[in-house]
Each structure stands twice: as C-alpha cells, then as structure tokens.
C-alpha cells in the first residue's frame, strides 16, 4: 500500500484515474502546477491524452518513480546514445499509433525520460534503413518526382559514403 498522497487525473475521454503524487510528479508539468497552485483536491484534466495512453504513461512513471531527476548535465550524454534499458524496450513494444501517442503525451506532460525513450525507439526503427524502407515502416507516401529524388541523391552523395 502506498503512503504517498494521491491525485486524480481526468483523461481526454472523461475517465478519472487515481495516481500517487510521487508518480504524477515525474511530469514536470504536473509538479510545477502543484507547486504553483497547491493541491485543490479536484481532478486534474489532462485534455490531450486519452485513457489508454494515460495509463501507459502512468505505468512508465510508476516503474521510474525512484529514478533521480534528470539534470542539464545528463542532456548531452543522453542524446548521444540510442541505448534503451530492457524494461523500457519491452514497454515500448506497442503499435505505432500508441508509440506516437506516448511520445506526444510525454512531450505535453514534460516527462523527459519517457520522451527520450520514445524518441530513441523511433530512432532505432529507422537506423540503417533506406528512405524507401523508412517510408514503408511508417506508411509515408513519396511525394518526390523521380527527377527530384535523383537531384536530392546527387546533392547528398557525401552522406552515403
């Protein structure tokens, strides 16, 4: 049983979800809001995040609630690697739509660690792939004419060496 006080979030689809405050404060948006406004006891609306995504975000925050807060010093080393720990890799084994919704929610809620894991997951999905393979992976239509594509390839030959 948790001894942390709880908060209630209301998802964009109107579902109330109870969350331990220490878990909720993995979100800098929520942490700063609570510091500025205090605890009102009312449900906190999370207008950009539906129930399924919010539950996934809370699951990640619960697993990482004891992680040290990230500092500015971590930023450079964090960005230089696409390594993801095993639990996070399993957590991110979701369909593409859910993956992108988690990334958007992490950005909106200002949860840097989760945003990093989501972005690294996408980076690993495209690493070493050709533009055609990337388009296929993400179901992206090619809007270049063959002439434009040839010109781009010629201009960027140096990148393929």
From Swiss-Prot:
Q: One GO term of the cellular component aspect?
A: kinetochore
**A molecular-function term among this protein's GO annotations:** DNA replication origin binding
Q: Which domain of life is it from?
A: Eukaryota
Q: Cite a single GO BP annotation.
A: regulation of protein-containing complex assembly
Alphabetically ordered keywords of this record: Ubl conjugation pathway
Cite the InterPro entries for this sequence: SKP1, SKP1-like, SKP1-like_dim_sf, SKP1/BTB/POZ_sf, Skp1_comp_dimer, Skp1_comp_POZ
Annotated region Interaction with the F-box domain of F-box proteins: where?
Answer: 103-161
Listed pathway(s): Protein modification; protein ubiquitination
In the record, the note on similarity to other proteins reads:
Belongs to the SKP1 family.
Quaternary data? Component of the SCF (SKP1-CUL1-F-box protein) E3 ubiquitin ligase complexes.
Q: What does this protein do?
A: Essential component of the SCF (SKP1-CUL1-F-box protein) E3 ubiquitin ligase complexes, which mediate the ubiquitination and subsequent proteasomal degradation of target proteins. Controls sulfur metabolite repression, probably by mediating the inactivation or degradation of the metR transcription factor.
Protein name per the record: E3 ubiquitin ligase complex SCF subunit sconC
Protein source organism:
Aspergillus terreus (strain NIH 2624 / FGSC A1156)
